[in-house]
Amino acid sequence: MESLVVHTVNAIWCIVIVGIFSVGYHVYGRAVVEQWRMRRSLKLQGVKGPPPSIFNGNVSEMQRIQSEAKHCSGDNIISHDYSSSLFPHFDHWRKQYGRIYTYSTGLKQHLYINHPEMVKELSQTNTLNLGRITHITKRLNPILGNGIITSNGPHWAHQRRIIAYEFTHDKIKGMVGLMVESAMPMLNKWEEMVKRGGEMGCDIRVDEDLKDVSADVIAKACFGSSFSKGKAIFSMIRDLLTAITKRSVLFRFNGFTDMVFGSKKHGDVDIDALEMELESSIWETVKEREIECKDTHKKDLMQLILEGAMRSCDGNLWDKSAYRRFVVDNCKSIYFAGHDSTAVSVSWCLMLLALNPSWQVKIRDEILSSCKNGIPDAESIPNLKTVTMVIQETMRLYPPAPIVGREASKDIRLGDLVVPKGVCIWTLIPALHRDPEIWGPDANDFKPERFSEGISKACKYPQSYIPFGLGPRTCVGKNFGMMEVKVLVSLIVSKFSFTLSPTYQHSPSHKLLVEPQHGVVIRVV
């Protein structure tokens, strides 16, 4: 009898296991067929690409190309096309298949587009059926949640309407004083370091200090607090970013195991616990600020956004959990985007100015003639044409986010090309920004004067200049970011003359943003 029970249990387990694998095989098989359909549809329209393997697509080839890629030699920093070392597979296949080609990673089919006319079509497409890439946004959820950066469809459009209103140019003009105030402790610290250095000057690693300033600006503008109070939040975001980006988002496998079990290994970091701690800290900060704002008429950016969200409900009450989700997810987005991208852009700008001291002189002269006491304000910033040109050229050579990614939730037409539902579209911004056919033979050179008549006349295809992304999903905080970069560059250059330190190592790295792996070290005199 006991033996019969054992055999029965074993038989049941066998049936269950076979059933699970049968269902998994069936689902996986359907996914493979669907991917084949997408690839065939693109091929029939003349889109070529590397032949994929049945299980992992072109991942193995991508990894091989990456391992063989040559990194920067350091001979010519400015002309260095870092995209060929950070994203060598894109460059490798472009030489083989042209500016439009297709490839796959596991069960995901991708379409690479770097043709100016197709980028223009992509930029002018307003459909909600072209959103963020779902498998990447899912992976970035601990950092960004389902806020304005990662959400799709009507949910994204709703958040965009609420948040964009508070980031218009007129709204942010009043924050210039706050930006100057946040920068002063850093500038005073640098002045003391220069005094101690004497005639030889001193070496300063600027990127870390700039991150502190950017964090302070975001903390004050959004939550009425200082960086010191929000330091734990920024630290958690950096820890999450480091853990999640250890494995390239572009190499994600998306095969059978990912489909059934997910992919949640991120080294030794407990992502779930860190995410919960981050969200709790943000929520506590918001609730504390709500109480403080009851006793004052002065409201920070987040309070204004929340009021806009409440008005958008047309009298309907928010579900409590939905309200908290909206608050936390968009705080994550603002913390991350406002903190890192601005600091990185200013760091690259100082690196380029260190190599081009004549542009430091031009900026300094402009600031002295336009800004009272050499300090920019809301009235003088629009007159800083040279500063603007230098920043635009910096963002051409070193755009903060190097890639635009979209996924078609339905069949989408881009010009003469029909992109099948489920295809992920990629545009490599540095490749567009350094293309000689678009920018001329000096595309790799630092020449801010190319923007002397504005973006529309800076190159052959102005729609190819996309440092803040493209289309309706252009960065909602670009006015805020540009204003802060102008303020910081103006203040630094007006007070200091500098060159690159001999210890500087030029090594751009990719962690969602293109960052200086070893920092930016300048010699200030």
UniProtKB/Swiss-Prot annotation:
Lumenal side: 1-3
Domain of life of the organism encoding this protein: Eukaryota
EC number: 1.14.-.-
SUPFAM superfamilies: Cytochrome P450
GO cellular component: endoplasmic reticulum membrane
Binding annotation for heme: C475
Intervals, Cytoplasmic compartment: 25-525
GO molecular function: heme binding; iron ion binding; monooxygenase activity; oxidoreductase activity, acting on paired donors, with incorporation or reduction of molecular oxygen
Gene inactivation effect: No visible phenotype; due to the redundancy with CYP714A1. Cyp714a1 and cyp714a2 double mutants flower earlier and have an increased plant size and biomass.
Cofactor(s) it depends on: heme
Keyword entries, A-Z: Endoplasmic reticulum, Heme, Iron, Membrane, Metal-binding, Monooxygenase, Oxidoreductase, Signal-anchor, Transmembrane, Transmembrane helix
Keyword Membrane: yes
Transmembrane portions of the chain: 4-24
InterPro entries xrefs: Cyt_P450 (IPR001128), Cyt_P450_CS (IPR017972), Cyt_P450_E_grp-I (IPR002401), Cyt_P450_sf (IPR036396), Cytochrome_P450_Monooxygen (IPR050665)
Entry's localization field: Endoplasmic reticulum membrane
Expressed in which tissues: Expressed in the shoot apical meristem (SAM) and petioles of young leaves, in the leaf margin and petiole vein of cotyledons, and at low levels in the filaments of developing flowers. Not detected in siliques.
Family under the similarity heading: Belongs to the cytochrome P450 family.
Function (record text): Involved in the inactivation of early gibberellin (GA) intermediates.
Any further remark recorded for this protein: Overexpression of CYP714A2 causes severe dwarfism with defective leaf development.
Name of the protein in question: Cytochrome P450 714A2
